[in-house]
Amino acid sequence: MKEANTRRYIYLCLVVVLLSIIITTEAEDDRLFCIRHHKYCGHRPKRCCSGLFCRCNTFGTNCRCQSKGALGKLI
């Protein structure tokens, strides 16, 4: 009986650890899975890393993660 309780306790500890990893990963999702500077972002415009935003040309194509210009940094 004691062995079964020990196994249950270990199993529950593992579940708690895995859930905390999943929650932490979701909270840090932008930092872990962001699109870097000068990379294509047309399919996910809100996924650029911090300090960057998705800029496209006049026709809405060739979208890339870029930093804000001088005027954009002041605003």
Swiss-Prot record:
Its main location: secreted. Disulfide bonds join C34-C49, C41-C54, C48-C65, C56-C63. It is found in: Secreted. Expressed by the venom gland and the whole body. Keywords: Disulfide bond, Ion channel impairing toxin, Neurotoxin, Potassium channel impairing toxin, Secreted, Signal, Toxin, Voltage-gated potassium channel impairing toxin, Voltage-gated sodium channel impairing toxin. The keyword Signal applies. It comes from the Eukaryota. Residues 1-27 form the signal peptide. The presence of a 'disulfide through disulfide knot' structurally defines this protein as a knottin. Negative results: Does not show activity on potassium channels Shaker, Kv1.4/KCNA4, Kv2.1/KCNB1, Kv3.1/KCNC1, Kv4.2/KCND2, Kv10.1/KCNH1/EAG1, Kv11.1/KCNH2/ERG1, and calcium channels Cav3.1/CACNA1G, Cav3.2/CACNA1H and Cav3.3/CACNA1I. Belongs to the xibalbin-13 family. Probable neurotoxin. Strongly inhibits voltage-gated potassium channels (Kv1.1/KCNA1, Kv1.2/KCNA2, Kv1.3/KCNA3, and Kv1.6/KCNA6, with the highest toxicity against Kv1.1 (85.1% inhibition at 1 uM)) and mildly inhibits sodium channels (Nav1.2/SCN2A, Nav1.4/SCN4A, Nav1.5/SCN5A, Nav1.6/SCN8A, and BgNav). Induces activation of protein kinase A type II (PKA-II) and MAP kinase Erk1/2 in primary nociceptive and non-nociceptive sensory neurons. Does not show cytotoxic activity. Does not have an impact on Ca2+, cAMP, and NO signaling in the cell types analyzed. This is Xibalbin-13 2. It comes from Xibalbanus tulumensis.
